[in-house]
Amino acid sequence: MKKAVITGATGSIGHALIDKLLREGVDVTVLYHKGSPRISTIPDGEHIKKIPCSLDEMKSLIPNENDYDVFYHLAWAGTTGATRDDADLQLKNIEYALDAVELAKKMGCRKFIGTGSQAEYGLSDKPLTPDTPTFPFTGYGMAKLAAGQLTKLKCRKLGIDFSWVRILSVYGKYDPEKSVIKSAIDKFTHNERAGFSKGEQLWDFLNAKDAANALYLIGCDSEHNESVYCLGSGKSAPLREYIETIHKLCKSRSEIDFGAVPYSKNQVMFLQADISALTNDTGFIPTIGFEDGIKELLD
């Protein structure tokens, strides 16, 4: 891989992926949402280009170059709150994903990598595999599932290799402020009382740098086409333990109130990835433990 395109690059995974690609000598082009306040966090440099192109503009974008290798489509509108069940918005996301495949073809890419979600599965009491039955209960999960299926067909038609990566819970420096880990760190570093659910749910957290390494390895792989992968650490622990670890590392005096926040409707109580297919195909193995990942965020 010599040249790559990324949409949705301003989140934790996107930032980590840019850093990984640049370290590996890959030239990176970022397509970013016009007016994004976070684009300033993307580094400038000889080997990185930034092109303003919102999701609804990909269809009309005429690229100046057509010698790219891999297209990473991370961007998605409506990932939190009520927007997850906004049917019209989620339908547009499917269209945008198909537009991204068309753009990948125009840019000369040999491979399209789309990012899905554990939300495609709904509820499961076993580790998630590419073959685990999918029963999404949110509009977001339904749209991700449909986007994965339809972009595969579009890639097949256009002669582009395809991979769909169902991402579980990834954390990093550029997480939303309301994410569990980011909000816990904020409360604990300010020694404020922090309320959470009971924390009984078994959860799989992966550091953004490990996620970026997985996406890089998938991009380099030319042997496996139309592959679906689950991306996580492959291990799970009670959410309560993760929160207590953060509290300890912050050396916080905060009172933790487990049970202050009720479980949501259809609360996922078990989340763990089976990464064996990903490891077998690409050699990916997570290397950053949860404690080390949190320490890095605190430094």
What is the meaning of each model-derived region?
Residues 4-24:
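N-terminal Rossmann NAD(P)H-binding glycine-rich loop of SDR-like oxidoreductase domains
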Residues 53-92:
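NAD(P)H-binding glycine-rich loop region in Rossmannoid oxidoreductase-like domains
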Residues 73, 98-137:
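Conserved Rossmann-fold NAD(P)-dependent oxidoreductase catalytic core, especially the SDR/UDP-sugar
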Residues 123, 135-163, 189:
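Active-site Tyr-X1-5-Lys
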Residues 145, 158, 163, 170-182, ...:
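Glycine/proline-rich active-site loop of Rossmann-fold NAD(P)-dependent oxidoreductases
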Residues 173-178, 200-212, 228-248, 288, ...:
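Substrate-binding strand-loop-helix patch
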Residues 198, 228-229, 240-243, 251-270, ...:
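C-terminal "lid/loop" region of Rossmann-like NAD(P)-dependent oxidoreductases
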Residues 208, 262-296:
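Conserved C-terminal active-site "lid" loop/helix of NAD(P)H-dependent oxidoreductases
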